[in-house]
Each structure stands twice: as C-alpha cells, then as structure tokens.
Amino acid sequence: MNKTLGLILTSVFLLSTLGIITGFVIPTQAANSNDAAIYTIPSVTSVSNTSNIVINLFFNATSNSTVGAQASAFNYGLAINYTLDAITFTVVLPSGTSYPLIKLNAKNFANYGYYDLAHNSIVLLLNTTASSTAKELAYSYEQSIGVTPSASYKIYNYTNKTVNVNQYMNELPLSMLIYMATNGKYNNLASLPVGTKLEFTYAGVTYIIAVSPTVKLVGELLNPLYTANSKMLPGTNYAVGRSNITVAVYDNLITTTTSPFNFTLTYSSLAPALIYWFVIANTTYTNNGASTPTASFQAPPFKQYFPSNSTILYSAAPTKSSILMFNGQMNVTAHENVTLTLQTGTNIYTSPNFNVTPPGNYTFSGKLGVGFNGFIYQNGSATLTATIFNGTINFFFSSTGQKAAFTFFLVPIVPINLGDNNGATVIYNGVSLNTGFPQVVVMFNITGNFTKSGSNYLLYGSVYEAELKPLGSTQLQKLAGATDSTQFVGNLISSASSPLVSYFNYGESTTTITGTSLSFTVLMPLKFIVERLGYIYLVTFHIWGPSATVTVTGVDYHGTQIALGSFRAYVALPSFYTLPKTPLVGLTCDNMYTLAQVSDAGSVLETSTANSNANNATVIGPYDLMSNAGLHVAIYNGSKLVKSGNLGLLPNATTAPITTTITLNGQTVALTYSSAPTAIYPVDFKFEPGFSYSVTTNVIYNTSIPTYVVTVYMPLKYILQTKIVMWYVSPDYAAYFYYSSTGQYQTSNVTLTFANVTPELVMPQVFPVGKLYMPFGINDPYYVFYSSISIGPQSGVIEAVENGFNVGNITSITVELNGMNESIVLSPLNVSKLLISSNLGEVSQCSPLFTTTLFNISALASLLGLPNAAALNGSYLYVTYHDIISGAYVTNRTLLVVGQFYVMPPTTPGSVEWILTAKYINATTGIPVEISYAVVQQPSAKVVDINAANASITQIQVTGVKIVSKYATVTVMYNPSNASTIVYMNGMFVASYGGNLISSLSETSTFGVYYGAVVNLYVATGTLSSPNGTMYVVLGSHKVAVGTANLYTYAGYHFGPYTALPLVSNVTFTVQDPVTHATLTGQTTLGAFNNTPIRLAPLGVSIPQTAQYKVFYYYSTPLVLSPTSQYIVLSVTSVISYPYPFYIETVSFLGYNVTTGTPVPGTPAFQTVYSPSLGPGVVLQVPVQSYQFISLSTPSEPHTVVMFAVPFAGGPAISLYPTFLVYANVTAISS
C-alpha cells in the first residue's frame, strides 16, 4: 500500500540530509506541537473516490481530560479505549442528507487504535481502499509521518504493549465505517458521490474529509529520436520498438525532488493477432463407459525432451495436424516503474528512461469462444462437438450419466530460436519448429457431460484454461525423464497444479425431446502472461507492428491517475549507400576513404559508443535475438567467395545534450537530456595491399558521430578480380518479422569493384643527351597508397617494391639506333650502372605519380659500346613496364638528341578541300569542275626548344615562310630592322605590316615541345562558273591575297576524256630560339583533296552538312507504292551554292536489300533537280516517280531502290554521305 508523504517527511529528510539533526528523539509528553483535537499527518482534507492511500488520523489526548489522565498514568490501553468511545462518525451526502452517528466503541475497534507517545495522541490508520483489515509495518507508519524509523520510537496498542518498529499495525478499512454509517447503502469510498463529507467528531471538534472529484494528472511523451532527426520517424507520436523516450508528468500533489511513477502500457493493433500454437501433448479422461474423445488435432508421439539443447523430439509424424491457430483481436498490457525528477520551479516531473516495450511481464488478453454442438439420439445416446481455435473435439455418450474430457497443452510457434530456457525446438519426421516452450505453456481441458434430470436431457460442456508457470530446472529435469507420451503428459499436468493464470467457464443446454440438436458457446478470455522476451511475442503475435497503437496511463505514488496519451509503433527499415560510386580507381591513401553510410532507426537499442544494451538491459541476446544483425562484408575473387563475415552493429553517436520545451498546465520547462542516437552510421572503407585477403576494423571517435573504419587487404594481383559486397541487417526483430519475405529487413547489397587502369610511363618525348641524367616516372592511381617505390635488379627485371609488395617490373630497356634495336641486359651490374636512384617518390601527398631522375645516359651509351653519349643522337630509348595489378605491359619512348633546338619529324601538311562536280552541258553531257571550298588543315610543325622551355617561355616565333608551287611563289618574312612583316609574290612586293604577324608555336604539355601552324592560310569558296577562289595569307587581322587557290594546290581528277593533274606546294618555314636567337628551318607541304557537294536523305531524316565519307545509307522502313501513291520523296541539299541542274539517278534491284546483280528494268531512271537557291541550309523535297523503275500493273515482290546524284546522265556521282541512298524494302501494288 502506498503511503501519503507530506511536508513533515520532506522537512525531516532535508534536515537530516543537511546534518542539522543527528537523530529523531522525542521527549515523553513534550514532543507534540499540534494542539488540535483532531488532525492528520500528512494533512488530508479531501480524497477522491478512487484514492488509494492510508490516512493517519490523530486524536489529541490532552483534548479529553479522561483520556489525558489515563495517558499521564501510562495506561495507554485505557487511553485508547476511552478515545474510541468518545469518537463519532457520520456520512453527509451532497444533498444534505445526514446519516445517524455511529460510535467507534472500544468493543469493535480497539484493535485499530494506537497511542503515539511522541504526539501524545491516539491514531487510527484509515485505509481508503481495503475491504477488510490490512496491515502495515510500524516502520512504514513512522516513515509516513516524517520521522526516522527507530526502535526508540514508542507506539502502544490497546493492550498497553509496545509495537516495535518491525511489527505490524492494523489499518482500519474506511469502507467498514461507510457501510456501518449508511446502514449498507454505500459500501466503500468509490460508491460515494462527489461532495460527500466524512465527519469525525471528538472532544467537541469535527474533522471533515470531503470526497472530491477524481484528479487526473496530465502528462506527455516526447521522442528524442524525432527531436534529434525528424526525418527518421514519420512523426513525433511514433516510436521504434525497444527504444527509450521521455515522459513528463505535471503533479502538484507531491513535492519530492524525485518520485516513483507506475505506468501502464496498453498495446492494441488494427490487425488481428495471429498466433500459431503447437500441440506438444494431449490426453483423455472418461468415466461410466463414455467413449474416448477424439479430436481433429493431436500431438506427435513423444520420444524425449533434451533440456541441454532445448529440444523436444517426437518419434513420428502425427496422424492429424499438431498446429492450431488463433486469429482475432487481442490487447496487451505491460507495467513500467520509472523514477521521475522534478524540474526546478515547476510541478513537472520528467525522465528520459521510459521504454516503449519494457522487458517486464506482458499480459496478453483476447476472446476465445468455444462452440459446443450436440445431438440427442432417439435411443438415448448423444454426441457433443467442441470447436476451439480451428480444431474440433468429438464426444460420444452411449447413455446419460457419462462424462469425458480432452486435455491438451499448447506452446506458441515462433519464427526464431528464443534461446535456452525461453524456447525449444520441436522435431518430428524431419520437421523442425521453434516454439515458446518452456516459458509459455497453456493447458486446455475440454469436458463434456451427458446427464438426465427428470424428463430433461442435459448436455454440459466446460472449458478450463491454465498457463503453467515458467518451468524451472527441477520441472524440466522431471520432463526430461519422461520416456513416453503418458509420462510427459503426467509431468505437464503436475506442473499445472499451481498455474500462473487460470480460467474456467461452462455452458449447458437441455431438452426433453430426443432427435434434437443442441448448441451453446463458452466464452473464454484466452489470457496468458509472457514474463521474458515480451517484445518478441508482441511482434510475433502481430500486436507490435505497422498498425499498433500504445496507450499510456499511470499513477503517482498517491495513486492519482495520469493521462499520457498514446503513440504509434514504427518498424524502421535500414538503408545503405556509398560514395564514390563503383567501380573504384585506386587504393586508399591517408583519409581518402570510400565513404558509406547506414541509416537505421531500428538500431537505437544500442545507445552508447560501446554498444551496451542501455535501453533494455534485460533483453536476452545482444541484438534482441537478431544474431546476424549488423554490417556484413563478403569478398569475392571473381565468382569465388573467399571471405565473409558479420562485423556487427555500428557504433552510435556519442550522446549530446538536446534541448526542447514542454508545457503542462501552463508551466513550461526546457528539457535538456542526452539524445538518443541519430541512427546515422558513417562507415569508411579503406583498401590496402595485403599478402592475403583480410579485414580489420577500428573506430574513430574524434567526431560526435563515431566513424567505423573497415580496412580490406587484398593481394595486388587479384585487385581487379576482387568484388566486395556489403549489406546491413537491422537488429530490430520487428523489421525481420514483417519484411523477411521482401528482404527489406536488410539493405540491398552494395557492391564495390575496381576499374582496370593501365599505368602510364612518364618519360620526356625528347631528351638532350648533354643533360646526362634522364627523368622517369610511373603514373597509376593504384599506387596512391604508397609514398615511395623502391626499384632495383631482380631476376632479369628491375623490380618496383613497396613495403615488401612487388607492384611491377621494368622488363626491358631497348635503344633504337640507326634502324637497329639494341637491348640492355638487366643484370645487377648493368642495372647498378644504368640507374642513378633506387627510389621513385610521389610528387605530392596521395599522388598517383612517382618520379625521379633515373637513367644515366652516359652509362647507357657505354653499355651499348658507344664512344660517348653524343653517339645516341637521333635514337629512341624504349622502356617496357609490367604492372602487377592490371597485368598490362606498357611501353614509352624518348627521342635522344644532341642539340636543344630542332624540328621534330614528321611535320603536318596543310590541306585544301575542293568540291568535285561537273558543269552541265545537256542531259547527257558535262565537263568536270573542281571548286575551291576551304582550308581544312594549316601547314604545322613541332619544334623542340629546350632553351625556351628552361626559360619558361611558352611560345616561339615563326620568322619566315616560303610557299613554292609550279606556278607561283609566296614569301612571308619578318624584317627585324624595321620590325615589320612583308609579303612578296613571285618576287614582287605585295604588302607590309608592323610587328611579327606570321605565326607562333605554343608549348605542349611535353617539356620543350612547341606546336602550331607555321602560316595561316584562307581560301575563298568558288562557284561552278568561277571555281577557283582566292587564297589569302592571314597576318593577324589582315588577309593578303596571293592569287587563286589553283596556283598552289589542286586535287585533280580523271573522267572520260577529261584529266586534271594534282598540284602540291612546298612550304619552308624558319623559327627563332628566343633565348639564343638562333634560327632553324623546316619543311612541310600544302596539298588538296576532293569532296562532292550533294547530300541525300530519306524524307524526314536529317541531313548532316559535313560528315565523314559514307558510301551507303540503308533505309529499311517498308515503302508501298501504288497508283495513288507513286512517288518516293527524298530530301536534297548542297554544302555549297549550287544553282545548276543535276539528276537523281535511280536503279532498282529485285529482292530485299539487294545492291548487286542486274538492275530491273535494265536502264536507270533520272529525275531532274534544279533550284536557283540550292545551297547550305536549303533543303529540297524531290519526288521520284515509281513507274520509271517499278511496274505498278501487277503486285510485285520486294525491290531494292538505289538513288544517287549525278551532274548528267552517265556522269560521276556527286552525292556524299551517302553516295548511294538505298531503300531496302520497296513493294509495288496495282491498287
């Protein structure tokens, strides 16, 4: 019974805590400072009709002279008796009705009175709820009035004997007084209307205790998981199973800084509970010749129970089903005691330790109707069928006076192994099922009885349900000794003799007429308690799930009710992603991790960085029986699995203060509490070389959210074949239970692979041998893990090694000299001479490039038997490297030269595009014409200038150009004396401009190599009537005309009697070293090539204006020609202005997609095309009539129609891209 604590308790507690008093010793007769005749400690002037407290009601001995005299004479027993005789009690209703006074005479109430020496008062302990005498320790009484319990505190009973601190005191039921006073009309406090007064009168003083309205305190539930990350949950009123949330209560009836509260959680679900039961045993009972009952279900034949591995073994399969099912609504209640702390300056108590699925007892309650159907035969026999769950039990009675019973034991079937002492596996005929035995075992006894009373036939049915107490080791060992079903059932029945819960109900039906059907239903609660693993059962029975609601109520230690509201169950599903996306390029350097992140609100059970079970410490198993929960990593070499493991759950964020506010009854407080984790789990993956596959883990705690680091070691030669698969399994059993079929209780697999990257050998394109020591490097992203690479001779190669790992080998060094290849034997002696360094160093932190000055060019010449390094001038140094990771062999080369300023062969020729067509004479005659179109490639060259590169000069200047052809010569030169650029043609002055405007060459990415056009030329586009456009030399913003383009270059042609020879010009150029001012001369050419102007395409298909040469374009869409649709329409355009007539020549072949053989008909058809405006951007739609090449008179098989452009009948094709347009599937029909 909870006791009401008042201000005295608080004061004494504070005084003793502060050390102001060392004990609580009260002198006889002098301790009571309260001179009221009647009073209470703590003060109670009203109670609600639902109050559950004990009221300490004091009657002052000094207020009654007779009582006082007895107390002074130490006759405490007589003082009690005289006091009781002087007390009257009555009940006054709100209407004013007053019941007659009753006396608390010593005859009836003496054993309830006590003399408290310290208070010099007689005290009654009024219990507001008890219906009969209740007791409490004197220790508890002393605490309730605010004193420190001790043996020196004196309390006497009506026999004048001392009541020691460890002895019991009788509590007077207030219900007894109410019943006596109202002559039985009201029998307890709860039955009295609000406003009723309970009046105690003594020594002329009346003490009134009013019946007040029921007080219901207000409270609220807050979910810090939502506060920490609102994206994690659908709303504030959702909670993940097993997690803690914050509870706040407004309670102005208590004043202690901390206080216990008792909360009741009621779980309900919109979905029906679905419970599968396994029948572990069954038996029957009969008397007076009744037949043995039969059932549609039965247990398999028992063989043995093994407690050591929690297994029940059956010898064979049952002949009938052993599984029953309950499908109906079920409510569940659980209780949770939580200590709340008072927030300063308010009446609000809070705690962050309210668990939404506490580990304590869960009471499951549903409705089970057992239907009985009977029939009384005319011969006086009867049958009775009981339907329970989805099974039936059949009774047969040959005559009245017979009775039979069917008893069976059920255990729930669960999807997972619940562990020893919580679950057992049943095995029969190869079938294996997990069950809740021995924790949840329910027995049902169904009894049928057939009797006759007078002329009435009576069919009677009863149902007895009992839940066995969780079986202990003694009972389990007894069950283990059973050798057959009879012994096993007997042991179970004996264990059911003192059940955890039990219920009984019966029904009956009577008739006087034989041949009559009878029916009745026995309603049962199907109520059982789960003492351990309650969360597992909540989920398994479909209570905690997506449609579950939890209503929370409570009481403080006064018994005052609290309304807290409700919340919804939330089953969270994990997610997982990585950055960067696969495939990866390279190993891991320093903190350049492959980042991954798991998000799972269902992982909140583990709320500390050490992953202790902070939320639900009594849960069996670290992850709520989800032993495979956590991060999984599997490593494959190709398709072969080489390593797989569960790395376990990930470390949660360190808890940090989270502040929010709550307002209750107008009071607002800021709540600061340690947050639940945000359920975001960063994972960093590192990939490093190893001699074998292995995985290590560690945690980085330098951030608020710890980072889990997973390092995967891989043999270098297998990296590209390695596949790493990762996934995360939620530890929440609800996620597994509801989503195991879809697999969403775990994340989708994240697969990491590695890209095949070929390393690059970094060597100068050109190296002057005079510098003697040539640089060398390797660029490979898979090397970023290293800071340097050692190189040295090993078995005929130059081995590259880091930390004992061979990353690659230089397999050959060859020199191409004077057309001959000479290889260097990579012996240790030769390598020691050739290499001037034993290490390649990374150019910067985590760089894929490793370089050093490596090759001794003088030693190279010596190894080749050359007199000196200059003898290597013009040779190429080839180096071949074998990369262990990719397996690739890569080669690069360097041109070795003596000088530092020269033209690199080969140079790039310039090129002018010409359009080949024909000038129209008549329909069958024309003259070929080439029309200048454009310069498509400027004459260009590469020049090596080491001096300019060393001086960081990015451009070198062309100082002179001479273009020489058979018909003309153009000279462009820079005159430094007057700083001007001058142009001559055939020795004659043409133009002059200030500055050097010829051209400049820009440095490429290769050291010392400069590239660009040596002169910039422009050719105007000609026409059919004036085909030779003017050529210009471009000098800055100036264009200088130097005659027509055909003076310098011509593509040439040969058609019929017409022939034109091609023309090419030589281009000589001079460049100057800006450092030494030395000049050098090089040569290239200016050439030409032919193009054709017309572009063709099927109607609706776009025509590219410029494109690479294409001979055929195949149009495979079927075309059907008929007398009403006789045309094939195509699109035609030209890349130049072409205001001249030309023809679309059409040839037809029999068959689908046939372009060879004999055309049908034998002669081609021609369609004239003419538009004065035809040119770039102008598209003509040209219809070609079909009767010219396909007969429409009779249905035909498919034809292939080929079209191309010609300047006249029999002329050359002048269409390009395509040259031939092919309609591959053309059919003609007659109508």
Swiss-Prot record:
Subcellular location: Secreted, Cell wall, S-layer
Induction cue: Constitutively expressed.
CC terms in the record's Gene Ontology section: extracellular region; S-layer
Domain of life from the UniProt record: Archaea
Signal sequence coordinates: 1-35
Keywords recorded for this protein, A-Z: Cell wall, S-layer, Secreted, Signal
Chief location category: secreted
Keyword ATP-binding in record: no
Oligomeric form and interacting partners: The mushroom-shaped unit cells of the Sulfolobales' S-layers may consist of three SlaB subunits and six SlaA subunits.
The protein's role, per its UniProt record: S-layer large protein. May form the highly ordered outer sheath.
Family designation: Belongs to the Sulfolobales SlaA family.
The protein, known as: S-layer protein A
The species this protein was found in: Saccharolobus solfataricus (strain ATCC 35092 / DSM 1617 / JCM 11322 / P2) (Sulfolobus solfataricus)
